[in-house]
Swiss-Prot record:
The gene is ddx6. It comes from Xenopus laevis (African clawed frog). A motif (DEAD box) lies at residues 245-248. Its EC number is 3.6.4.13. Residues 126-297 form the Helicase ATP-binding domain. This is ATP-dependent RNA helicase ddx6.
Amino acid sequence: MSTARTENPVLMGMSSQNGQLRGPLKPSAGPGGGGTQTQQINQLKNASTINSGSQQQAQSMSSIIKPGDDWKKTLKLPPKDLRIKTSDVTSTKGNEFEDYCLKRELLMGIFEMGWEKPSPIQEESIPIALSGRDILARAKNGTGKSGAYLIPLLERLDLKKDCIQAMVIVPTRELALQVSQICIQVSKHMGGAKVMATTGGTNLRDDIMRLDDTVHVVIATPGRILDLIKKGVAKVDHIQMIVLDEADKLLSQDFMQIMEDIIMTLPKNRQILLYSATFPLSVQKFMTLHLQKPYEINLMEELTLKGVTQYYAYVTERQKVHCLNTLFSRLQINQSIIFCNSSQRVELLAKKISQLGYSCFYIHAKMRQEHRNRVFHDFRNGLCRNLVCTDLFTRGIDIQAVNVVINFDFPKLAETYLHRIGRSGRFGHLGLAINLITYDDRFNLKSIEEQLGTEIKPIPSSIDKNLYVAEYHSESGEDKP
């Protein structure tokens, strides 16, 4: 059965006959992402965006801090996140962001993001990156990797120079938008730090026009930035730092040659930072060729997030939708992401979910870019509880309201499984991963358990809400009634 090319993002089945529609959600802005709705709408009008700097300058001028003032009193802090956190993010050395001698304007942006103290990956990365040394960092999904490289990147900018000084390469368009939003928010008090996102699927001419103005930081997908470099539009001869986020994907066969071509255009004394949850042989080869005495960070004693509880349910293919309906009726879902193995199955499942009476978005790579942007933006802002998607949505995407991930189709690769379930349990919070397993999936299930050194348990008749529902926990450890 074929499915036509998707022309519009679909909000499916906005009925309220089930318990899932309880008004708009407001995901908290945590260390992996977030941002104001206005910023996100502006970002998503075009996939390639640049902050003007004028707003940031105005903010800085309106809240000038004189020496000796208690500058922290002027900060507009978000509500404190009282959800329980696991040792993935709490097992730190006790450092403070102020220990790294960062610019006060940068510290203001950090604290206003709600980042109170550095996570383990940030503690390890920030001082080394500030020293100018290359880094090979391995850390779990959702533990603060974006902050680990954006903070030193912004600290090292010289805003007096009218040139691109840093570049962040990511594998997907949605991740590029997310990282650029974080970068703009963290740098908003720096008075003129200009950040541009550029991705494929958007108007190249718009990017060329934006690069005529001052740009300090470029956040891009590989193909688009290489195109701009080859056209002589993106001048990269003054770049001092390049970051490869999700390095294992960027150095896979899909992107390897493009990444090699990009690296060859950069100055020889540039700093390279590699971040990923997994490091296959391709990453090791790249490190040997291009990194100079890299500082290696490995915070991966175990691969899966401590806060994610994993279950499986044995079903036939025909029972999957019925099983999903049962899960929807019994689980207390804040937001869920449901993975399928093909674009066609994504659309078919989204239609089925809407027929069951549940609200549902879907997203996959065959959709037009502006529609992907809108779905990403609206789901992140809590306009819908459930998102059906392909593996397009597994890389780095940080939506902290997601507490349940369902593998409607079980993946074949351990790496894919790891990235999928990492969409819940972000930044040390709790989450649930449920896998629908057919007879043909049973060998993959066993293999993935062995490769990841994890246990995927049979699903019980009733799942304890303390395992995945945020409001059942507080920092004091007391359960709410």
